Amino acid sequence: MEQEDFYFPDTDLDLSFTSTTTDRTFASSSARTSLTLSFNDRLSTSSAVTTSSTSSSSVNHRRHDPHWSAIKSAKLLSSDGNIHLRHLKLIRHLGTGNLGRVFLCNLRDSSARFALKVIDRNCLTTEKKLSQVETEAEILSLLDHPFLPTLYARIDESHYTCLLIDYAPNGDLHSLLRKQPGNRLPIQPVRFFAAEVLVALEYLHAMGIVYRDLKPENVLLREDGHVMLSDFDLCFKSDVVPTFKSRRYRRSSSSPSLRRRRSGCFSVAAEKKYEREEIVSEFAAEPVTAFSRSCVGTHEYLAPELVSGNGHGSGVDWWAFGIFLYELLYGTTPFKGESKEQTLRNIVSTTKTASFHMDGDLDEARDLIEKLLVKDPRKRLGCARGAQDIKRHPFFDGIKWPLIRHYKPPEEVRGLVIKKSTRPHASHVIAVSPRRRKSFLWRALSYLLRGKSSSGGSKNQSNSNYYHYVGKSYASRKRV
């Protein structure tokens, strides 16, 4: 449940209440803060200050969002056609990050709510942090994906940079984990959240963006229960060359008859496995040439090549994805030590590996994590073909990736409040196989034809029987 809203005094330029002092490390609302070190990498010197607003025409999947209508109305009422701080009303503080603070706000005379990230540039003591502000603003302006935030406006006034983005009322995944028994999630919600995070990382890598700060604290949850990655100040960009190839591979899967008895594509059941060979055409866009020497991220999520300082690429995101999966399942990270230094030693140690105590039906999760936590990035899953290799793993078997946005979020997660939607979810739509659906249609047709030669009452009865069969089939496969 949301906290009771309260409003800050009206202000245009005075944002002193948002500032953090320069004589201490920024506080963080999350349990773990990110670090930033440098191994002689080149810093960006770009620090241009502008006032801009992203156009809804450049954000195709959100162009009909009512938030854009509110933004457009506010811009029409503005003398210069831009969004300013005077158009916003701050409601309450949401959290504090590495660079600034985040507030819940809305546009005046509008119920549309946003998150406003406020950065006091006077409190950023290094050129590196100033560069990170520009990096985050630039990357946010490029994003157009349902599992990533939309930048509605950037506001630069006085020594403040403000980024107006989506508000996620369900908080972050780290806070949600703390509400669960044992600080961990059942396998069905883990598969749901992991699949959406994987798709978000795939999009970033296709844009040539290496994220470098994946952790539950940075996975926000929208009002509909779907994920939204946040905090892009530690990203770096690289060139990427998309490829489209046909390839043959062997895939382990459950038999079709048993798979139809699953309660949902994110559920787990003891099923007979068999091998089948497929030839598929794949699109891949992994920034394999990406390279950086910066040591940035969160200690428990740092990849071995990143800790060593010898340089790293996009593989650090797939290592972090393996740590992310492990934490969702276990409530802790696999290499955590008694201190940050011990954690880093465990990560780079050639003898220290992740320990597992999983049930027999979770062997697929263990296998995926082990392949992601390979300390040699050249052998790590995902480093060659990106997310495509990970999507084919049996852990994600049964997921219809083009329909991922329409799957119903898990309802059994404690503390997750999902806004009801009238839109049908894919977990219901794909529950009946095409063969079974065809059988229902033929059966319905036979009832209708039989009804023409009988009384009207029989016709009505035949229709009711048809809906009975369809409804029964859907109900028997609906996820609990």
From Swiss-Prot:
Localization in the cell: Cytoplasm, Cytosol
Domain of life: Eukaryota
Function: Serine/threonine-protein kinase involved in the regulation of auxin signaling. Acts as a positive regulator of cellular auxin efflux and regulates organ development by enhancing PIN-mediated polar auxin transport. Phosphorylates conserved serine residues in the PIN auxin efflux carriers. Phosphorylation of PIN proteins is required and sufficient for apical-basal PIN polarity that enables directional intercellular auxin fluxes, which mediate differential growth, tissue patterning and organogenesis. Acts as a suppressor of root waving.
Annotated ranges, domain Protein kinase: 88-396
InterPro entries: Kinase-like_dom_sf, Prot_kinase_dom, Ser/Thr_kinase_AS
EC number, as in UniProt: 2.7.11.1
One Gene Ontology cellular component: cytosol
Reaction(s) this enzyme catalyzes, per UniProt: L-seryl-[protein] + ATP = O-phospho-L-seryl-[protein] + ADP + H(+); L-threonyl-[protein] + ATP = O-phospho-L-threonyl-[protein] + ADP + H(+)
Record family assignment: Belongs to the protein kinase superfamily. Ser/Thr protein kinase family.
Coiled coil feature spans: none
Entries under Pfam families matching the protein: Pkinase
Keywords on record: ATP-binding, Auxin signaling pathway, Cytoplasm, Developmental protein, Growth regulation, Kinase, Nucleotide-binding, Serine/threonine-protein kinase, Transferase
Name of the protein this chain belongs to: Serine/threonine-protein kinase WAG2
Lineage of the species this protein comes from: Eukaryota, Viridiplantae, Streptophyta, Embryophyta, Tracheophyta
Gene Ontology biological-process annotations: auxin polar transport; auxin-activated signaling pathway; cotyledon development
